[in-house]
Amino acid sequence: GGCINHGQPCDGDKNDCQCCRDNGYCNCDGIFGLKWNCKC
């Protein structure tokens, strides 16, 4: 368990986004609804 730290990869799902410690969301590159390179 545990939360994902700032700068670590995440999958962009709600649980990951709520669990990012420092900024509270996942930032993803993406287009047409596809996401990649997601980081907290």
Swiss-Prot record:
Main location: secreted
Superkingdom, taxonomy of origin: Eukaryota
GO molecular function ontology, one term from the record: toxin activity
Pfam families found in the cross-reference section: Toxin_34
Localization in the cell: Secreted
A GO CC term assigned to this protein in UniProt: extracellular region
UniProt keyword list: Disulfide bond, Knottin, Secreted
Tissue expr: Expressed by the venom gland.
Signal peptide: none
Keyword Transport part of the UniProt annotation: no
InterPro entries for this protein: Toxin_34
Disulfide bonds: 3-20, 10-26, 19-40, 28-38
Role played: Not toxic to mice by intracerebroventricular injection.
Family statement drawn from the similarity comment of this UniProt entry: Belongs to the neurotoxin 04 (omega-agtx) family. 03 (type II/III omega-agtx) subfamily.
Domain statement: The presence of a 'disulfide through disulfide knot' structurally defines this protein as a knottin.
Protein name as annotated: U4-ctenitoxin-Co1c
